[in-house]
A protein has these predicted regions:
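Alpha-helix termini
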Residues: 4-7, 38-52
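Terminal substrate-recognition subdomain of acyl/acetyltransferases
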Residues: 45-205
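Short, well-structured alpha-helical interface segments that form or flank functional binding sites
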Residues: 9-12, 27-31, 35, 80-87
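A conserved beta-strand-loop-helix scaffold within acyl/acetyltransferase catalytic domains
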Residues: 1-21
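A short acidic, glycine/proline-enriched capping/turn motif at secondary-structure boundaries
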Residues: 21-24, 63-65
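Conserved acetyl-CoA-binding loop-helix of GNAT-fold acetyltransferases
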Residues: 19, 25-42
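A generic structural motif
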Residues: 18-23, 124-127
Length: 205
């Protein structure tokens, strides 16, 4: 149904691209990403029934939903500034989907993660059919995230997508540069959450 209506042959989900700190700025992440996309295309090309567009997804932190402590702690762990990382993904064609995304809890005693965005790379267009996103997250949540446990949050999000037609895609590197400046300002240190610094929570440049 999804394939026939939207010419979608597959969806992919990138969990991580990991590059050791001493090997950064050598283009390794770009090469790994290109190789992943090339390998996926080659695998899909083996089947005549898998013709059409590929939608690639990845989760990223949403800095505007983070406190200063969360932001800089993650920068320290990742050894890259959060906004620089988002601008990099944006330049690679991965832009955020405009809806309140969250990752369901990874275990029964954990909470859902609500400071994430879901980003997508597609061949063209500024919207993604909600049905494609619904089917992708249904598989991603129940295979990779929830595994052997169930919480109602995943069902609610997947169900909500079933009531939508399309989800808008947004994001520009300039937006992340403005966001980055806010984190390094004295005002941002004293006022949290950061989203309060913007008139519109999803400003794009």
């Amino acid at each position: 149904c999804v394939k026939k209506k939207y010419d979608c042959r597959a969806t992919l989900h990138i969990h991580y691209i990991l590059v050791r700190g001493e090997y950064r700025s050598l283009g390794i992440a770009s090469r790994l990403l290109n190789e992943m996309e090339r390998s996926a295309d080659a695998w899909l090309a083996q089947s005549e029934c898998l013709r059409g567009r590929v939608f690639s997804f990845c989760e990223q932190n949403a800095p505007e939903l983070m406190t200063s402590e969360e932001y800089f702690t993650d920068c320290l762990h990742a050894r890259i500034d959060q906004c620089d990382r988002l601008a990099w993904w944006c330049k690679k064609g991965y832009n955020r989907l405009r809806f309140n995304y969250f990752q369901p809890s990874l275990s029964e005693d954990a909470k859902a993660c609500t400071i994430l965005t879901l980003n997508v790379k597609q061949a063209s267009g500024t919207q993604v059919p909600a049905l494609i996103l619904q089917e992708h997250l249904r598989r991603f949540f129940y295979i990779s995230v929830l595994k052997a446990h169930e919480d109602g949050t995943a069902s609610r999000l997947v169900g909500w997508l079933g009531t939508q037609n399309r989800i808008e895609v947004e994001g520009r590197p300039a937006f992340y540069k403005r966001l980055q400046k806010s984190f390094y300002s004295s005002e941002a240190v004293t006022r949290r959450p950061l989203s309060l610094l913007f008139d519109e929570p999803n400003v794009t440049g």
